[in-house]
Design a protein with these regions (language model features):
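Alpha-helical cap/lid subdomain in secreted, periplasmic
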Residues: 1-131
Length: 131
């Protein structure tokens, strides 16, 4: 905020779903993202909220099944964005496979996008930034 950006892009939540820093509920994760958006809005910064990318497993956290949590978090973020007239960038729909994970060709580990994945994401985000 102190750098006074004109726009902030919020793409967050997957590491929290993976419980990388300990257990978190979907509501806790959503509230953290919403708090960031509210701080930006209060400082006249344009907010763009991005969907969490699809994931149906974590190679480093075998016991966690994230697909339903990702969908639930994305729904909360989409509804918040709509109600608050914020841009919502839907990467999920463009990148999901039939088993609710990241399309194999778009990432190496099923979580993080590769170059092909970023090439899918780029025009979607550019459209939101330019609107």
């Amino acid at each position: 905020i102190h750098l006074k950006p004109s726009t902030v892009v919020l793409l967050a939540g997957i590491n929290d779903i993976a419980e990388n820093t300990g257990p978190s509920t979907i509501e806790m994760i959503a509230n953290n993202i919403i708090s960031m958006a509210e701080l930006a809005k209060a400082n006249q910064i344009k907010v763009i909220i991005c969907s969490v990318l699809p994931a149906n497993n974590f190679p480093w956290r075998k016991g966690i099944k994230p697909a339903e949590k990702v969908r639930k978090l994305n729904l909360i973020l989409q509804l918040y964005s709509y109600k608050n007239k914020l841009a919502y960038v839907d990467y999920y729909s463009a990148m999901v496979n039939d088993s609710h994970g990241l399309k194999k060709e778009l990432g190496e580990d099923g979580i993080h996008p590769n170059k092909k994945g970023y090439l899918i994401m780029e025009p979607i985000l550019e459209k939101a930034i330019n609107n």
